[in-house]
């Protein structure tokens, strides 16, 4: 039996690293297609590329073989080559590049904050408010349109070719670091690192409330909310609904009514930090979709309400920033590590909370 992730109840996306955000502004297209195959008990031995080719519509055998060569086909959790002999009750997971886009991506002169660039890749610092990739309703003004302009004189880079370009995504209103592959080989090698979870990324977030512990671990399956397709919701770890997700957090600074934290993802699910923090009662400050624009902690005085309104105006998006990014260079094999300072809106928001808390004493834990 074969199921695409789109066909599985509440189980739309395998990895937030490699797929689109559920934000409508991000569009519906994914960077990769993900499949899971559960082999029947009576299956006779056969090469896995032939087995998959016979069961997958609109996929060539060459496309499947390329996925195997890249390490994107796993059987029972381990990578296999295209000549692997399928056995009864095997569980196969695979990731395939999507075909070329139906809509042409046009180069647009949009400023880019380039942190690093060489012949194989570039690392950019994405501002909040910039959609990563063209999609339904957003075919212009995206990060990929900007990259297409920046690389318009590079003959080998075609922004419409899924074998180059984005390796992972962050939401429209999340700021921070992203890596872009300029060659097919670079994208394959980088994609494998994300697929195998050997990259390192950390986020800074301001959340509502005073977290009890200085550090913690949140575990809970993440799936689309059946009542709101633009939200994700959390189910118990032993649930058959959703995909396993683990978030580690560490407190950086406390402001009584809010807390600045660092988050490291053990998995990469859609809206993982946003959904997990909401789940434990500490949604991200300013995150309208997950309840973070309400006054959830603190006084009810008019001055306090005015302070919160000012903060929400100062940073009118979820207070989340992709601060660090680490991976092995696909050509040199060198470890590459990057850090991005908090953008002005988040830095100013943190400053306002410091000033507020320093002017108030006797604040209780909330």
Regions found by a protein language model. Name each.
Residues 1-366:
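RNA pseudouridine synthases
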């Amino acid at each position: 039996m074969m199921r695409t992730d789109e066909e599985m109840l509440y189980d739309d996306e395998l990895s937030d690293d490699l797929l689109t955000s559920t934000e409508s502004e991000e569009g519906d297209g994914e960077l990769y297609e993900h499949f899971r195959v559960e082999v029947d008990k009576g299956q006779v031995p056969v090469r896995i590329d032939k087995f998959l080719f016979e069961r997958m519509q609109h996929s060539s055998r060459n496309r499947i073989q390329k996925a195997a060569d890249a390490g994107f086909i796993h059987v029972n959790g381990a990578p296999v080559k295209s000549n692997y002999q399928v056995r009864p009750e095997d569980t196969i997971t695979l990731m395939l590049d999507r075909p070329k886009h139906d809509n042409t991506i046009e180069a647009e002169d949009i400023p880019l904050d380039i942190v690093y660039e060489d012949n194989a890749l570039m690392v950019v610092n994405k501002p909040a408010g910039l959609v990563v990739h063209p999609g339904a309703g957003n075919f212009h003004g995206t990060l990929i349109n900007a990259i297409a302009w920046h690389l318009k004189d590079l003959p080998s880079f075609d922004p419409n070719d899924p074998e180059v370009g984005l390796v992972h995504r962050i939401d429209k209103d999340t700021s921070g670091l992203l890596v872009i592959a300029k060659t097919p080989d670079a994208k394959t090698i980088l994609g494998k690192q994300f697929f195998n979870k050997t990259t390192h990324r950390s986020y800074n977030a301001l959340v509502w409330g005073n977290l009890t512990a200085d550090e913690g671990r949140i575990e809970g399956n993440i799936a689309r909310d059946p009542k709101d397709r633009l939200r994700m919701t959390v189910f118990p770890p032993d649930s058959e609904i959703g995909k396993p997700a683990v978030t580690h957090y560490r407190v950086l600074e406390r402001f009584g009514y809010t807390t600045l934290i660092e988050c490291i993802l053990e998995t990469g699910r859609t809206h993982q930090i946003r959904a997990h923090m909401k789940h434990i009662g500490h949604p991200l400050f300013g995150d309208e979709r997950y309840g973070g624009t309400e006054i959830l902690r603190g006084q009810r005085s008019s001055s306090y309400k005015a302070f919160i309104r000012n903060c929400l105006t100062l940073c009118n998006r979820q207070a989340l920033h992709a601060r660090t990014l680490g991976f092995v260079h696909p050509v040199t094999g060198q470890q590459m590590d990057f850090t991005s300072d908090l953008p002005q809106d988040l830095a100013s928001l943190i400053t306002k909370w410091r000033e507020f808390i320093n002017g108030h004493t006797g604040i209780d834990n909330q």
